[in-house]
Amino acid sequence: MKLDLLAIAPHPDDVELTSGGTMIKMAEAGYRTGILDLTQGETGTRGTPQTRLQEAARAGKILGVAVRRNLGLPDAHLSVSDEYKAAIAAVIREFEPRTVILPYWEGRHPDHYTAARLGYEACFVAGLKNYALAGIAYRPFKILYAAAYADVRPTFAVDITKHYERRRRAILAYTSQFRPPKRDRKSKVELPLDELEERMSLQARHYGRMIGVKFAEGFVVKEVFQTDDIVKMPVRSM
């Protein structure tokens, strides 16, 4: 099965938080989408690996993805190794996605910026004919970096106003992370609990204001954008 869009992230729930609305929008547009979670988030404060896999499966259904896979790499121990690159490259060759979404290449969490480099290099080596890996050589056409976890101005933003509520439901499918039992609420971590709804809204509204819509998700690309019609370009200048 070939995919049009594959989102790669270090932990279950990262895709939902950074590009969930975009995944929903692309699936509704008829594109075949998928998610590759690199780890099970087993070193996190809340939940078990099995619980998070179950939550990821539920969230994936809400997002409408055709496939969701977990590589089971060690959480908090990601590195740009040949072994990990080959594991991701094998998935790239299997699904042949035209577009890949990666985390932004800078950030607070080592797994996030490591996943960005790891994903990029895996996409590259997947296209090397003589690389020691099963399958036919294939390299994605476009790589996007989700801007949500980084203090960076996005290259472009995707209007997710019509998909915001469904994205919200996908995020809240991670009950162990965002709606834990009271007995598990003693420890505080960076990901919000009571403040989650407000933070989700503020961030989506922030990107939305940039393009004149209610809610949006931001992305960064390293290449210059091409346009063939400067008269009908979107987003007002004033």
What spans do the regions from the language model cover?
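Metal-dependent de-N-acetylase/amidase catalytic core
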Residues: 2-6, 80-238
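Active-site rim/loop-helix segments in enzyme catalytic domains that contact anionic ligands
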Residues: 1-95, 220, 232-235
